[in-house]
């Protein structure tokens, strides 16, 4: 099962002792390490499917087939925290918006490949990426894991890691919830740099940084306001 390395554990203890974590418990820094590792793994996933030219004629200079991407965009409150540093909170949720690119005019996918097939290919890649890091599926007695709804347009996976630090408040579970929703952003996404919270707080001279497609702040805030209005209606 995925757990911190000895060096990572020592770094968190040292940071806590030095007051670098401020009032945050060590379990928060630990969970951020695992969330960041999971996000990095997701950022490395590249899913494409071939679309073939329709009614191709002899001598046509256009390519016979082209690759069409299935993209992931990091979203939600955790994105506001990790990508933009706008909120200071810990979440076990990794919210992802899925963008299914369409073939250009004159091209089409094989009849055997539909939206559900493209989504399932992405879900399988996500599962392989996370289990490859050592995360394990959470076994739930009363629920399936992962959960798929709406023709696989909604997908939710719970994975666990081995916790070294205990959260005395009991609010942090050694789990991550990864939600993928097939709903493209309205505003074009942005590439943002992500890294470990501990390295940011400690001012590391050589931090681990990677890039990931992220939803814009404006769209995230609009979604939060809309969600609040629906709850109050």
Give, region by region, the residue ranges found by the protein language model.
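Catalytic cores of NTP-dependent nucleotidyl/adenyl transfer enzymes across multiple folds
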Residues: 36-40, 123-233
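Generic detection of long, well-ordered alpha-helical segments
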Residues: 25-32, 115-123, 215, 233
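N-terminal regions immediately upstream of nucleotidyltransferase
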Residues: 1-61, 108-114
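Short, compositionally biased low-complexity segments
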Residues: 1-15, 94-105, 192-200, 219
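Metal-dependent nucleotidyltransferase catalytic core
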Residues: 98-141
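Active-site nucleotide-donor binding segment shared across nucleotidyl transfer reactions
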Residues: 43-104
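Short, histidine-centered active-site or binding-site loop motifs used for metal coordination
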Residues: 16-19, 100-102, 229-232
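Short, conserved acidic/polar surface loops in the N-terminal third of protein domains
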Residues: 83-87, 107-111, 191
């Amino acid at each position: 099962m995925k757990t911190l390395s000895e060096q990572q554990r020592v770094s968190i203890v040292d940071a806590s002792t030095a007051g670098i974590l401020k009032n945050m418990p060590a379990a928060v820094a630990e969970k951020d390490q695992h969330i960041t590792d999971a996000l990095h793994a997701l950022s490395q996933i590249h899913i494409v499917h071939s679309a073939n030219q329709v009614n191709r004629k002899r001598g046509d200079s256009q390519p016979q087939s082209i690759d069409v991407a299935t993209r992931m965009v990091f979203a939600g409150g955790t994105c506001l925290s990790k990508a933009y540093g706008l909120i200071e909170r810990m979440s076990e949720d990794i919210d992802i918006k899925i963008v299914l690119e369409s073939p250009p005019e004159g091209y089409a996918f094989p009849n055997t490949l539909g939206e559900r097939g493209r989504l399932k290919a992405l879900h399988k890649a996500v599962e392989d990426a996370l289990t490859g890091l050592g995360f394990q599926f959470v076994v739930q007695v009363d629920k399936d894991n992962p959960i798929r709804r709406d023709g696989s347009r909604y997908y939710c996976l719970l994975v666990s890691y081995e916790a070294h630090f205990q959260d005395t408040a009991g609010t942090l579970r050694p789990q991550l919830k990864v939600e993928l929703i097939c709903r493209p952003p309205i505003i074009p996404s942005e590439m943002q740099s992500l890294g470990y919270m501990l390295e940011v707080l400690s001012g590391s001279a050589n931090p681990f940084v990677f890039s990931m497609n992220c939803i814009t702040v404006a769209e995230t805030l609009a979604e939060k306001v809309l969600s609040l209005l629906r709850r109050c209606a």
